[in-house]
């Protein structure tokens, strides 16, 4: 009896699925996009019926996707990839840079699952990052690292009294979370 790979089924006669790996990706739009949604919702005006941004409407630009590593002796470092729309479309016509970078991680996870079918459920940091990055690399564009002197307190405008720790800018109390 054949079953879809890598689903694991019980050994009894009913053959029910006891393990079926899944991938999940969560994305949060940038602050300007969220602000735009709030403005539309709060305006009291009905939004247009529908507008889907087509691939042809994206004529230039790119995406910087990375992580800010902070709180160490050198302050903070942004590490990530920069992919232009032209580079993305050279890899896959009608695609965009953000989609290419993001789905490269999903592709890497799927390859890892296919190559490690008996590992069961694992956290992302338990996967072989070297192998995953090798799968992702063609879809990431330029990989860059940049140090910065930015801190959560650098450009803060305190219009109202707030708790903050001026002795260590990297304390959680200094971050504004919404």
What is each PLM-predicted segment?
Residues 1-2, 8-178:
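C-terminal catalytic/substrate-binding lobe primarily of soluble NAD(P)-dependent oxidoreductases
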């Amino acid at each position: 009896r054949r079953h879809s790979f890598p689903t694991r089924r019980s050994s009894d006669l009913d053959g029910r699925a006891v393990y079926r790996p899944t991938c999940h990706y969560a994305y949060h739009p940038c602050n300007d996009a969220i602000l735009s949604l709030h403005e539309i919702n709060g305006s009291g005006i009905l939004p247009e019926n529908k507008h889907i941004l087509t691939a042809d409407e994206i004529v230039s630009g790119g995406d910087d996707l990375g992580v800010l590593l902070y709180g160490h002796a050198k302050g903070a470092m942004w590490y990530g990839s920069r992919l232009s729309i032209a580079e993305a479309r050279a890899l896959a016509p009608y695609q965009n840079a953000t989609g290419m970078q993001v789905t490269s991680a999903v592709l890497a996870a799927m390859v890892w699952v296919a190559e490690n079918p008996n590992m069961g459920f694992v956290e992302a940091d338990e996967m072989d990052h070297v192998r995953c990055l090798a799968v992702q690399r063609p879809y990431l564009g330029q990989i860059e690292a940049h140090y910065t002197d930015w801190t959560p307190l650098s450009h803060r405008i305190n219009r109202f009294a707030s708790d903050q720790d001026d002795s260590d800018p990297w304390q959680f109390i200094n971050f504004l979370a919404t």
